[in-house]
Amino acid sequence: NGTQSNAYRLSQKGGLNVITLPKTIDNDVAMTDICFGFDTAKSIATEAIDRLHTTATSHHRIIALELMGHSAGWLALGAGIAGGADVILIPEIHYDIHAIAEFLNNRRQSGKRFSIIAVAEGATAVGSVPDSGEEASGGKKTGKKKAEKKADPKIVTSGSQQEPVMIREPMVNRIVRELQALTGVEARMTQLGHVQRGGTPTSTDRLLCTRL
Protein backbone atom coordinates (compact mmCIF):
# COMPACT_ATOMS: atom_id res chain seq x y z
CA ASN A 1 0.00 0.00 0.00
CA GLY A 2 2.72 2.48 0.95
CA THR A 3 4.78 2.02 -2.21
CA GLN A 4 1.92 2.67 -4.61
CA SER A 5 0.48 5.50 -2.50
CA ASN A 6 3.82 7.28 -2.27
CA ALA A 7 4.40 6.84 -5.99
CA TYR A 8 1.04 8.49 -6.62
CA ARG A 9 1.94 11.39 -4.32
CA LEU A 10 5.24 11.89 -6.10
CA SER A 11 3.50 11.99 -9.47
CA GLN A 12 0.78 14.37 -8.30
CA LYS A 13 2.69 16.71 -6.00
CA GLY A 14 6.29 16.25 -7.01
CA GLY A 15 5.81 16.68 -10.73
CA LEU A 16 7.69 13.45 -11.44
CA ASN A 17 7.04 10.78 -14.02
CA VAL A 18 6.73 7.62 -11.96
CA ILE A 19 6.53 3.95 -12.91
CA THR A 20 5.73 1.43 -10.19
CA LEU A 21 5.67 -2.35 -10.22
CA PRO A 22 3.05 -4.45 -8.39
CA LYS A 23 5.20 -5.95 -5.62
CA THR A 24 3.43 -7.28 -2.54
CA ILE A 25 2.81 -10.65 -0.94
CA ASP A 26 -0.75 -9.50 -0.22
CA ASN A 27 -1.59 -9.52 -3.95
CA ASP A 28 -3.89 -6.54 -3.44
CA VAL A 29 -2.69 -3.90 -5.90
CA ALA A 30 -5.68 -2.63 -7.85
CA MET A 31 -5.99 -3.36 -11.58
CA THR A 32 -3.39 -6.15 -11.53
CA ASP A 33 -3.88 -9.87 -12.08
CA ILE A 34 -1.04 -10.94 -9.80
CA CYS A 35 1.75 -9.23 -7.84
CA PHE A 36 5.25 -10.63 -7.72
CA GLY A 37 6.15 -11.91 -4.29
CA PHE A 38 2.70 -13.39 -3.79
CA ASP A 39 3.44 -16.81 -5.26
CA THR A 40 6.62 -17.16 -3.20
CA ALA A 41 4.85 -16.23 0.04
CA LYS A 42 1.94 -18.52 -0.83
CA SER A 43 4.33 -21.43 -1.36
CA ILE A 44 6.02 -20.82 2.01
CA ALA A 45 2.66 -20.59 3.77
CA THR A 46 1.41 -23.73 2.03
CA GLU A 47 4.47 -25.66 3.19
CA ALA A 48 3.84 -24.46 6.75
CA ILE A 49 0.27 -25.79 6.61
CA ASP A 50 1.55 -29.09 5.21
CA ARG A 51 3.93 -29.42 8.15
CA LEU A 52 1.26 -28.52 10.70
CA HIS A 53 -0.88 -31.41 9.50
CA THR A 54 1.61 -33.85 11.04
CA THR A 55 1.46 -32.50 14.59
CA ALA A 56 -2.25 -31.70 14.41
CA THR A 57 -2.99 -35.27 13.36
CA SER A 58 -0.74 -36.98 15.92
CA HIS A 59 -1.96 -34.89 18.86
CA HIS A 60 -5.62 -34.57 17.78
CA ARG A 61 -5.49 -30.78 17.99
CA ILE A 62 -6.99 -27.71 16.44
CA ILE A 63 -4.14 -25.62 15.08
CA ALA A 64 -4.57 -22.08 13.77
CA LEU A 65 -1.86 -20.56 11.58
CA GLU A 66 -1.79 -16.77 11.36
CA LEU A 67 -0.69 -15.43 7.99
CA MET A 68 -0.11 -11.89 6.79
CA GLY A 69 -2.96 -9.97 5.22
CA HIS A 70 -4.29 -7.04 7.20
CA SER A 71 -6.95 -5.98 4.72
CA ALA A 72 -6.71 -8.62 1.98
CA GLY A 73 -7.05 -12.37 2.40
CA TRP A 74 -5.48 -13.63 -0.81
CA LEU A 75 -2.48 -15.17 0.94
CA ALA A 76 -4.48 -17.04 3.58
CA LEU A 77 -7.06 -18.08 0.99
CA GLY A 78 -4.53 -19.37 -1.54
CA ALA A 79 -2.32 -21.15 0.98
CA GLY A 80 -5.32 -22.47 2.87
CA ILE A 81 -6.83 -24.07 -0.21
CA ALA A 82 -3.50 -25.42 -1.47
CA GLY A 83 -2.51 -26.75 1.96
CA GLY A 84 -5.87 -28.31 2.71
CA ALA A 85 -6.87 -26.11 5.64
CA ASP A 86 -10.26 -27.01 7.06
CA VAL A 87 -11.23 -23.42 7.87
CA ILE A 88 -9.99 -20.21 6.24
CA LEU A 89 -10.61 -16.81 7.81
CA ILE A 90 -10.04 -13.64 5.77
CA PRO A 91 -10.64 -9.92 6.35
CA GLU A 92 -13.23 -9.66 3.60
CA ILE A 93 -15.69 -11.99 5.35
CA HIS A 94 -16.43 -11.66 9.08
CA TYR A 95 -16.43 -14.99 10.86
CA ASP A 96 -18.89 -16.46 13.38
CA ILE A 97 -16.94 -18.30 16.09
CA HIS A 98 -19.95 -20.42 17.04
CA ALA A 99 -20.46 -21.55 13.44
CA ILE A 100 -16.78 -22.50 13.24
CA ALA A 101 -17.01 -24.45 16.50
CA GLU A 102 -20.07 -26.31 15.24
CA PHE A 103 -18.25 -27.20 12.01
CA LEU A 104 -15.21 -28.49 13.92
CA ASN A 105 -17.41 -30.54 16.24
CA ASN A 106 -19.10 -32.09 13.21
CA ARG A 107 -15.68 -32.99 11.82
CA ARG A 108 -14.78 -34.84 15.02
CA GLN A 109 -18.08 -36.68 15.05
CA SER A 110 -17.36 -37.85 11.50
CA GLY A 111 -13.99 -39.28 12.57
CA LYS A 112 -11.69 -36.34 11.81
CA ARG A 113 -9.57 -35.93 14.93
CA PHE A 114 -7.78 -32.73 13.95
CA SER A 115 -8.42 -29.42 12.20
CA ILE A 116 -6.23 -26.78 10.57
CA ILE A 117 -7.32 -23.14 10.40
CA ALA A 118 -5.62 -20.56 8.14
CA VAL A 119 -6.15 -17.09 9.59
CA ALA A 120 -5.30 -13.81 7.86
CA GLU A 121 -4.06 -11.34 10.48
CA GLY A 122 -6.87 -8.93 9.59
CA ALA A 123 -9.70 -11.43 10.04
CA THR A 124 -12.44 -10.14 12.33
CA ALA A 125 -15.51 -11.58 13.99
CA VAL A 126 -19.06 -10.53 13.20
CA GLY A 127 -19.71 -7.19 14.91
CA SER A 128 -16.04 -6.37 15.46
CA VAL A 129 -14.37 -3.02 14.80
CA PRO A 130 -11.44 -2.66 12.36
CA ASP A 131 -8.34 -1.28 14.10
CA SER A 132 -7.11 0.76 11.15
CA GLY A 133 -9.02 3.89 12.13
CA GLU A 134 -11.61 3.29 9.43
CA GLU A 135 -14.78 1.31 9.18
CA ALA A 136 -14.96 -1.69 6.88
CA SER A 137 -16.77 0.50 4.35
CA GLY A 138 -13.79 2.83 4.15
CA GLY A 139 -15.24 5.70 6.18
CA LYS A 140 -14.00 7.15 9.45
CA LYS A 141 -15.03 5.59 12.74
CA THR A 142 -18.13 7.10 14.24
CA GLY A 143 -16.97 6.60 17.80
CA LYS A 144 -20.00 4.47 18.69
CA LYS A 145 -19.35 1.43 20.81
CA LYS A 146 -19.45 -1.88 18.99
CA ALA A 147 -20.32 -5.29 20.32
CA GLU A 148 -16.79 -6.58 20.00
CA LYS A 149 -13.27 -5.24 19.68
CA LYS A 150 -10.83 -6.62 17.15
CA ALA A 151 -8.47 -7.74 19.89
CA ASP A 152 -8.28 -7.68 23.65
CA PRO A 153 -6.29 -4.72 25.04
CA LYS A 154 -3.83 -5.41 27.82
CA ILE A 155 -1.64 -3.13 29.93
CA VAL A 156 2.06 -3.92 30.27
CA THR A 157 5.04 -1.96 31.56
CA SER A 158 8.07 -1.16 29.46
CA GLY A 159 11.29 0.80 29.89
CA SER A 160 13.27 1.92 32.91
CA GLN A 161 10.43 4.07 34.23
CA GLN A 162 7.91 1.25 33.89
CA GLU A 163 5.51 3.37 31.87
CA PRO A 164 2.21 1.67 31.01
CA VAL A 165 1.93 0.61 27.38
CA MET A 166 -1.26 -0.55 25.68
CA ILE A 167 -0.85 -3.66 23.54
CA ARG A 168 -3.44 -5.73 21.73
CA GLU A 169 -3.64 -9.48 21.71
CA PRO A 170 -3.51 -10.99 18.19
CA MET A 171 -6.94 -12.10 17.03
CA VAL A 172 -5.65 -15.62 16.38
CA ASN A 173 -5.00 -16.02 20.12
CA ARG A 174 -8.60 -15.17 20.85
CA ILE A 175 -9.86 -17.52 18.15
CA VAL A 176 -7.88 -20.43 19.59
CA ARG A 177 -8.96 -19.69 23.15
CA GLU A 178 -12.64 -19.47 22.22
CA LEU A 179 -12.59 -22.58 20.05
CA GLN A 180 -10.96 -24.62 22.79
CA ALA A 181 -13.67 -23.50 25.20
CA LEU A 182 -16.49 -24.18 22.74
CA THR A 183 -15.26 -27.56 21.45
CA GLY A 184 -13.36 -28.98 24.41
CA VAL A 185 -10.52 -29.83 22.03
CA GLU A 186 -6.95 -28.74 22.70
CA ALA A 187 -6.16 -25.81 20.40
CA ARG A 188 -2.86 -24.20 19.53
CA MET A 189 -1.77 -21.26 17.39
CA THR A 190 1.37 -20.41 15.49
CA GLN A 191 2.43 -17.25 13.65
CA LEU A 192 4.50 -17.62 10.52
CA GLY A 193 5.59 -14.01 10.85
CA HIS A 194 8.28 -12.55 8.62
CA VAL A 195 9.37 -15.98 7.37
CA GLN A 196 6.71 -15.65 4.68
CA ARG A 197 8.24 -12.40 3.42
CA GLY A 198 11.64 -13.79 2.44
CA GLY A 199 13.43 -16.70 0.86
CA THR A 200 14.24 -17.80 -2.66
CA PRO A 201 11.60 -16.69 -5.20
CA THR A 202 9.55 -19.37 -6.91
CA SER A 203 9.94 -19.96 -10.63
CA THR A 204 6.54 -18.32 -11.16
CA ASP A 205 7.69 -15.11 -9.48
CA ARG A 206 10.98 -15.18 -11.38
CA LEU A 207 9.21 -15.50 -14.71
CA LEU A 208 6.76 -12.74 -13.80
CA CYS A 209 9.58 -10.37 -12.84
CA THR A 210 11.50 -11.21 -16.01
CA ARG A 211 8.44 -10.45 -18.13
CA LEU A 212 7.89 -7.16 -16.30
Residue ranges and their predicted role:
Residues 178-186, 191-212:
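C-terminal active-site/capping subdomain that shapes the small-molecule cofactor and substrate pocket
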Residues 22, 33, 65, 69, ...:
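Short glycine- and Lys/Arg-enriched binding-loop motifs that mark or flank ligand-binding interfaces
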Residues 5-10, 30-32:
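Short, conserved acidic/polar surface loops in the N-terminal third of protein domains
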Residues 17:
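Gly/Ser-rich helix-loop-strand patches that form or flank binding pockets
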